[in-house]
Amino acid sequence: MSSGIILLIVAIVLLVIIAYLIGVIIRKRNDSMIGTLEDRKQHLFGLPVNEEIEEVKELHLIGQSQTSFREWNQKWVDLTLNSFADIENHLFEAEKYNDTFNFIRAKHEINNVESQLNLVEEDITSIREALSILKEQEEKNSARVTHALDLYEKLQSSVAENDSHFGTTKPEIEKQMKNIETEFSQFVTLNSSGDPVEASEVLDRAEEHTIALGQITEQIPAIVAKLEDEFPDQLDDLESGYRRLLEDNYHFAENNIEEKFQEIREAIRSNASELVSLDLDRAREENSHIQERIDNMYALFEHEIKAFKVSAKHSKIIPSYLEHAKSNNDKLKEEMTRLSRKYILNENQASTVQGFEKEIEDVEKNVLELAKDFKGQEIPYSELQVVFEKNLKTLSAVESGQMEVFESIKNIENIEEDARKEADLYVTQLHMIKRFMEKRHLPGIPQDYLNVFFTTSTQLEALMDELSKGKINIEAVSRLRDVASASIANLEDYTYQVVENATLTEQLLQYSNRYRSFEAGVQNSFEIAMHLFEVEYDYQASFDEISYALETVEPGVTDRFVSSYERTREHIRF
């Protein structure tokens, strides 16, 4: 056998071996893929779709929800009966073809199974999502219905508990309750007949009406309590109080109080009747108006009761206060009469006291009898209070005025006595000032000083003349005393100034002798100053002249002399 044939045989054997090996590899790979698809199929088939379907089925769906559930349930049945069986057949075919090394057909079957599994997986996902939505939707609807029913049950319970607190609104509330019950029945009917949209709308309305009626029933008892309990009780209290006040001789400016009571009762009845419409805002507003009218009646009675207490107090004060004012005025008149014998009094004071007397008489005429027979008057105590307070203010003003007049006249005699003492003192001081000037032995007295001296003397004489009159004008005395006091003080200061200027000038003139022989300016000022000093008696001008000249040649000399003088200056000994 030739070598070529041997090589060919070897090559063929090798090809067969290689082909077999490749076939084995492909077969193993296909086995692996078929196994994976089998696992996937088992996984999909093992999903808890049946359990989820049973859960939704137990919800007892109705209407559109039930129809939708049936469609998805049927789809799952189709998948389990048809799709999974078909997939199982194709897997079997794929295994058979793979085992017989028919890899092309095996591959075709594998691809077919994979596509079917993808579709089944998508369908199962859709079914589960739909079931979840149906379950969630039904749970929401159930919770919503439960919530609405709970609200209604609470409303029923609340209405039953407060049955006696609704007054005239009870029939209307019962009517509204029946309407809500009808709406719930309508909801059940529509929901069962497969009209979920309209059923939902009806449920919404039923819930809204339940909430609204619940809010109304919560507010009604407070309104009814006012109309049936509080207002009638307050009105009964007012009427009984009014009768007691009339028995106690109270009077009122208003003459229609009984009519007002009737009007308030009618307003209460009217508001209670109209409350049946459940217009709570209007009812509350009307209640506020009724309460305001009742409060006004209370305020009226309380005002009169308070006025009675105040007037009773005033009625006790007025007689004694009036006597006090009369006594004060009599004493004031007596004192003014006594003082008028010796003094000229202010005419305004006399007329003021007469005015007090007139006011006291008016009070006595207008009020005294009212105060004494306080409880026997047929006018409201509030009006009596106004009258009493007005006249008490008058008496208070009279008393204040009396005190002012008394203060103005009580010290007249003391003023006179003090004025006489001061006048004597001023005369003595005038003589002492004159003696003080004489002892200075001045060349002469300045005319200005003489004018001040004689003016002061004249003012003292005027004061003495006024004090010596038969009837003393005390106002004039006070004025002249003040003038005399100021004049004496001014004369004393002027005296010290004249003496100081004269003394210092004389000392400086003597001191200037040091410079006269060689300072022409000092000599000239010396001559001028001597003329002013000895001839014109102008000591101030003389001092200014010589001090200025000396300051030019010896600065500070004037201050030295002034300081020395002030330390040793002699004072007038009064």
From Swiss-Prot:
It is a single-pass membrane protein. Residues 102-140, 243-379, 459-520 form a coiled coil. The chain crosses the membrane at residues 8-26. Residues 1-7 are extracellular. Belongs to the EzrA family. HAMAP family: EzrA. Negative regulator of FtsZ ring formation; modulates the frequency and position of FtsZ ring formation. Inhibits FtsZ ring formation at polar sites. Interacts either with FtsZ or with one of its binding partners to promote depolymerization. This is Septation ring formation regulator EzrA. The gene is ezrA.
